Amino acid sequence: MRLTIIIPTCNNEATIRQLLISIESKEHYRILCIDGGSTDQTIPMIERLQRELKHISLIQLQNASIATCINKGLMEIKMTDPHDSDAFMVINPTSIVLPGKLDRLTAAFKNNDNIDMVIGQRAYNYHGEWKLKSADEFIKDNRIVTLTEQPDLLSMMSFDGKLFSAKFAELQCDVTLANTYNHEILVKAMQKATDIHLVSQMIVGDNDIDTHATSNNEDFKRYITEIMKIRQRVMEMLLLPEQRLLYSDMVDRILFNNSLKYYMNEHPAVTHTTIQLVKDYIMSMQHSDYVSQNMFDIINTVEFNGENWDREIYELWRQTLIQVGINRPTYKRFLIQLKGRKFAHRTKSMLKR
């Protein structure tokens, strides 16, 4: 078979060499490095590796997003002879392919003409040891499924560890989205796939340092607006309630609430802007399926991490919760209860030590 591997890059000098030298396969393959405008040593490093290793091509774009770079790679697949690619992968530039594992995917793909996707497990680097990502724990054995049979696939909104039939090169990432550009393309591919082969082995390891898209107020606003938009779009694409619940759980719990925790740890003072953004998100949840516990977890994040509450901001928060059927006490009683909860939490933490 013939495999095309797309790697979108931009200022990845710390990891790109490790990734490129980790890619090995018995199959005929080519690597397309699509650079979005690196200003560090990423491009010189790729050019040096082109002289050392076969199969590497470099395409340079200017001021291009990750989505634009991936789309350029997909266009290259469509523009070349159909026999040049039977399948493709997109690999994050901060990842590596674990030794001997790439051909686990290619072997599964060749095994059955109905296989349109092969999905392996992803790993993360924990003190130098590769650990299975919790979202991939449902892949317990090698088997063939569909999205209808395995809705847990919707918790894996990442290209890493996935091999696609070349026919899906007609799909595109959303260039208007900075963080969730791949959600729709992945869902469409899963929905269109005749069969999906799951491989219960860790294929790709992620070396990425956790960089949050919510470090300041403007970034946080853009990020929340984006995930509300993609959540609505994808929920409208999913026909089965179980699929919608699994996808919304991933977005509400991991993308929204985890980012909210990080933002409020950095900016604990409760502001009108913060409450309004959380209100907008909570209200958007009411128009689709969601896991009720996630709503309470979001509320707990705001109340427990927030500081410097005043009467006006609390009343906005209280009225928001009343609109979704959740009662809250008066301002003074809330402050007393909150103080007690925080004291109990600190005491419990001290006892654990």
UniProtKB/Swiss-Prot annotation:
SUPFAM superfamilies: Nucleotide-diphospho-sugar transferases. Its EC number is 2.4.-.-. It comes from the Bacteria. Pfam families: Glycos_transf_2 (PF00535). One of its GO terms (molecular function) is glycosyltransferase activity. Gene3D superfamilies: Spore Coat Polysaccharide Biosynthesis Protein SpsA, Chain A (3.90.550.10). One of its GO terms (biological process) is regulation of cell shape. InterPro entries: Glyco_trans_2-like, Glycosyltransf_2, Nucleotide-diphossugar_trans. Keywords: Cell shape, Cell wall biogenesis/degradation, Glycosyltransferase, Teichoic acid biosynthesis, Transferase. It is an enzyme of class 2 (transferase). CDD domains: Glyco_tranf_GTA_type. Belongs to the glycosyltransferase 2 family. This is Putative glycosyltransferase TagX. It comes from Staphylococcus aureus (strain MRSA252). The lineage of its organism: Bacteria, Bacillati, Bacillota, Bacilli, Bacillales.
